[in-house]
């Protein structure tokens, strides 16, 4: 009976050691996975910031260009000869979407 008890205790100790080693291995894997995910997120953020820098620098210039085109279109449309009058006139702030020039009432 003593031999069988010691075998059971030895088996139990080996099982507990194996369980502890498995738990530590799983913990290391989890830690590595979390570290890898954090590192990947940082690299992705750095790449996005690097790629967005030229766009952020160009945005004010693009907005200005867009505004100039819009103003130029309005000026061109509104300084055309008005069919209701025989002279050129600057427009009010009517959008140039109507069939008649915006300088006409």
UniProtKB/Swiss-Prot annotation:
Chief place where the protein resides: secreted
Per UniProt, subcellular location reads as: Secreted
Q: Which residues form the signal peptide?
A: 1-21
- What post-translational modification does the entry describe? Contains 3 disulfide bonds.
Q: Name one GO molecular function term.
A: toxin activity
Q: In which tissues is it expressed?
A: Expressed by the venom gland.
What are the record keywords, sorted? Answer: Disulfide bond, Neurotoxin, Secreted, Signal, Toxin
Q: Which organism is it from?
A: Scolopendra mutilans (Chinese red-headed centipede)
Coiled-coil region(s): none
For whether the record's keyword set contains Secreted, the answer is yes
Give the record's GO CC terms: extracellular region
Q: Which family does it belong to?
A: Belongs to the scolopendra neurotoxin 10 family.
Protein name, please? Putative neurotoxin 9
